[in-house]
Amino acid sequence: MAMQEKYPNDRSHATSPGSNVIQKGSSLGTEWQTPVISETFRSRFSRCSSIADSGDTAIGTSCSDIAEDFCSSSGSPSFQPIKSHITIPTAHVMPSTLGASPAKPNSAPSGPSSAKLPLSGLTEGVGMTRNGDFGAVKRSPGLARDFMYLPSAAGENGSQQSWFPAVGHEREGEMRKFDVPSMESTLNQPAMLETLYSDPHYRAHFPNPRPDTNKDVYKVLPESKKAPGSGAVFERNGPHASSSGVLPLGLQPAPGLSKSLSSQVWQPSPDPWHPGEQSCELSTCRQQLELIRLQMEQMQLQNGAMCHHPAAFAPLLPTLEPAQWLSILNSNEHLLKEKELLIDKQRKHISQLEQKVRESELQVHSALLGRPAPFGDVCLLRLQELQRENTFLRAQFAQKTEALSKEKMELEKKLSASEVEIQLIRESLKVTLQKHSEEGKKQEERVKGRDKHINNLKKKCQKESEQNREKQQRIETLERYLADLPTLEDHQKQTEQLKDAELKNTELQERVAELETLLEDTQATCREKEVQLESLRQREADLSSARHSFQDKQSVEEANGENLRVDMESQQKECDSLRKMVERQQLKMEQLHSQVQSQKQELAQEEGINQALREEAQRRETALQQMRTAVKELSVQNQDLIEKNLTLQEHLRQAQPGSSSSPDSAQLACELHQELASCLQDLQAVCSIVTQRAQGHNPNLSLLLGIHSTQHPGTQLDLQKPDVIRRKLEEVQQLRHDIEDLRTSLSDRYAQDMGENCATQ
């Protein structure tokens, strides 16, 4: 009675169909029905899932509240079947609860929407998510950073092609259905536990189921706090390594259990034989076993959903630069290292979870074996059922571990293939970089060659500009020379002026001669008059002396008579007349002196004119001398050209009987003939100009400026004919004769000028 009053919930549910089935199974021992989840457990589990959906990791909830939830649900009959209408014979192992018909609304969906996993670590960079529930991602801000990097991130080409594991579609059915292994259940299962839970390569995600109105929607677990027994710290900003690393979201513990609660649940009671505490502990153990079984089912569903991924997420390889390829390779290596660290941490977490499962099973075994008699049969039956289900789950877990190990091997093979491809890509990048460097060197050499060519062209341009400047200066000097050259009218005027000046010069010379003769005559007359003046002066002196003597005599002989006075008066008159004559002669001498001065001035002017004429004649003589030297040089050059022409003609005559010359030599000979013809024409023009200037004629301006008539191009083909060569020789001989005539005329003119200069000097 005490036990019945202490567990009223068990008694109240005795009339339920689940309790009837249990009593029937205990009495008959032939049929077993799978347990069903109680309503209180479902409400508690929905509360846990709501906490998980909100992104909270049971931090705000206290351990006492969770413990009260567990203790309040301990009175409910937790040994009720999940599928109440499925019977399994005793001779076989109990099948999994996931093996029910897919037509049930509560069963897991077979499509990829049953478990919607977002991409881990790539939601920000790639912006791709599975077409599932985006609300779970939005509700938890740390999900995008806490998603696990899948092992097959490196594709076939060594780049990030596919972010989902490449599992065939034929394994999808294997993930969804479970085969019942043919093994019998026993009470002692430590060896099976050690063999099945000792594999550290187990990888699985344990999403938190969220009950809705008609079906259970499985969502991703949020970040949890530090798991009991592990050194990993789960933060909201993403998995940061603490002491033993981070854990993926699928391997986190249930959000409804905190650290204190799990330690309270799994630790043995200090007084196991107290009936009230044993009942609470058994209820918590049963609830924990239900949680483990549900997590295993969810793991199987999750793995079945993970095996089906579309292949349309594999992006094509972009055509990038070598530097971008190198950065991509470095980032891929970094991601592979991070994935290896995550795999190691997941293995550690799996081993810790296996250890916890072993401890929980040992506690359950100890609690069930140490339970007093009132619930012995029911507990033994329930324990056998749980052991059968546990063996089945262990077999499924072994199959899963084998499949995951095979998948790991495939991923390692893909990783090795991707590493080989990365190595090939690196080698190709090295080759391309070498090619680019070689091409860069070639381009630099080309640029240097072009720079040299440009510098040479600049130098040539500078030389040509200097030559053009010199030519421009030459043209300016020629223009000045042409401007200074007199025209025909100016030349005629200058010749007329020269003739007039020569006539004036002759007239002035004649006048000078006349004036010189007149001057000589006047000088002679002046001399005679001076002699006369001297004689007159002497006579005057004699007369003055005689006068004095006469005066003396007069004084002595005043009284000698009047005859003497008459004589004196006559002599005085004679002296006056002589004095007047002398004055007249002096005036005439002054006039003659002034005339001589004017004649001297005119002679000085005439001498200046003669000096200017002499200088002009000297200039003309120097110009004639320069022309003679130029004509001599031209004659020498003409002689050399004639000799060269003759030698070339002889060579051509010698080469014609033998073999015909090459086209290059023929072209050169043709060009030489053309140059000789142009030189011959220039020499003829110079000779004509010099002869015209020597003869006093006006030169031909067209010849002086070098303006030639254009030669007909047909004459270039006739240079090799003997008639043309003979005619050219005659022209050269005529030119030589003209040069000789010019030389003789220049020498005659020079001799004449020299004679005139000597006569004038």
Swiss-Prot record:
Bias class Polar residues marks the residues at 14-33
Major subcellular location class: cytoplasm
Pfam family membership, one: CC4_CEP85
Keyword set for this entry? Chromosome partition, Coiled coil, Cytoplasm, Cytoskeleton, Nucleus, Phosphoprotein
Cellular component, GO annotation: cell cortex; centriole; centrosome; cytosol; Golgi apparatus; nucleolus; pericentriolar material; spindle pole
* Annotated spans, Disordered: 1-33, 95-117, 226-279, 435-472
Gene Ontology terms describing biological process = centriole replication; chromosome segregation; negative regulation of protein kinase activity; neuron migration; regulation of mitotic centrosome separation
The segments labelled Required for centrosome localization and for its function in the suppression of centrosome disjunction in the record are 433-475
Biased composition of type Basic and acidic residues is found at 435-454, 462-472
Recorded superkingdom: Eukaryota
The terms under GO molecular function for this entry are:
identical protein binding
Which residues lie in coiled coils? Answer: 333-656, 723-749
Query: Which InterPro entries does the record cross-reference, listed alphabetically?
Result: Cep85/Cep85L
For the region Mediates interaction with NEK2 and is required for its function in the suppression of centrosome disjunction, what residue ranges are annotated?
Answer: 256-432
Q: Give the Phosphoserine positions (modified residues).
A: S16, S140
Its localization reads: Cytoplasm, Cytoskeleton, Microtubule organizing center, Centrosome; Cytoplasm, Cytoskeleton, Spindle pole; Nucleus, Nucleolus; Cytoplasm, Cytoskeleton, Microtubule organizing center, Centrosome, Centriole
Describe the family membership recorded for this protein in Swiss-Prot or TrEMBL.
Belongs to the CEP85 family.
Q: What does this protein do?
A: Acts as a regulator of centriole duplication through a direct interaction with STIL, a key factor involved in the early steps of centriole formation. The CEP85-STIL protein complex acts as a modulator of PLK4-driven cytoskeletal rearrangements and directional cell motility. Acts as a negative regulator of NEK2 to maintain the centrosome integrity in interphase. Suppresses centrosome disjunction by inhibiting NEK2 kinase activity.
Q: Describe its assembly.
A: Homodimer. Interacts with STIL (via N-terminus); this interaction is essential for robust PLK4 activation and efficient centriole assembly and for PLK4-dependent cell migration. Interacts with PLK4; required for CEP85 to be able to drive centriole duplication and cell migration.
Protein name, please?
Centrosomal protein of 85 kDa
